[in-house]
């Protein structure tokens, strides 16, 4: 049985450029959809957060505008999260996870990762070790790729340099109303760091696979990103 550790942000606020705190956390759909798909496929799932803190759901992720104006979809996500109970509210500490303990690491999005996962002191070493093992899979969706920025090798080079990848685009950040006050933009940082960033039209489902690295553009890409991971599992794990 393949195993996956799903990493969710432990942040409940995102500090904006003007120093104001914006309520945030992990994005519901970007956790629920992959978790359900992984569970249905029989994967052994572990949930982790920085410090093992109880993660906060980004309140915006239940907004109808980000859920195809489908109230039923929002209710389904809320019910799914409630059913997980202590599995979600008492996660493993990211600091305790090891690369040899899992086949897959999946970084869940929401603006929370911009606050904590992007600067996590130990997660990067796990990501590097897994990227360097062709039998392991590293995946991230939406703002989850912010966590990939920690994956520096001992010589200082970024482990995702020259890899094709995606994540929340500048256009999407602008349309969501955060670009002007964001401390930095994910697309810009991925490009500057050396990634071969690619995207589709805003809000279109889009997943990119480059070897054992799988990334999804935004919340509507959660399903196709999880599907791409499961397809890789069938041939690598």
Task: State where each predicted segment sits.
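Extended, subdomain-level signal for the structured scaffold at the beginning of enzyme domains
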Residues: 1-135, 146-237
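Catalytic nucleophile serine of serine hydrolases
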Residues: 142-144
